[in-house]
């Protein structure tokens, strides 16, 4: 457990100050530093845990295409890695959009308050995210899996003046619960992909998310999410409804729904994913990715 608390402290303490002036902040004044007025990688709705943490070393690379409701287009390359911290109950996750390429329409630039004098197309690196994921409880006959996650994002993403990234730190913490039922072979619970059977899983999550805005202020939000999973030996489908609710109520309440179809074979997981922004996240997203995992803890 010592590694758990050390990792949490490192995450909470690894934050930088936003490059904004501090001058008598007016808490009633809306900032507009919110998902509705920035690029899709500014502070998207975090991927939801399903009550379980990764107990394998998992490396993932994906390509994303974001198609804005106002005609703007963003493509990026996403990288993610999960590293178990000497136990199958705790892992460190690091992810980032390594590079994005974007083209904004004049309409979108007006919505985001980008000056006409700036070019609405270009490329740039994104923010880096870190999280510690902790398995608090494993499911029993009637009890669900419970996982706690503490995460922060860097202020490394640039092009604030082009409304691509916030240029400020942020963090979130959430608790997820999930329960599975098995059809065909109860042994699938222990043997994973090696067993024949179907897993049906339902999960929910709730948490707190925060990011610094301007003038020394921050926006606090409540996170939420529901998820369903159907998984067989070689294929799985997962659908998620999630979002967060900021206190300013000015473009800071993104809500999305997405579905992912994955294959499973010999440690590889190719997948395709589609995401639709329901509110305050004006983008369709299509993703194609490949993940590979290795049992470095030799638990099997």
What are these regions (language model features)?
Residues 166-246:
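Detector for outer-membrane/organellar transmembrane beta-barrel domains
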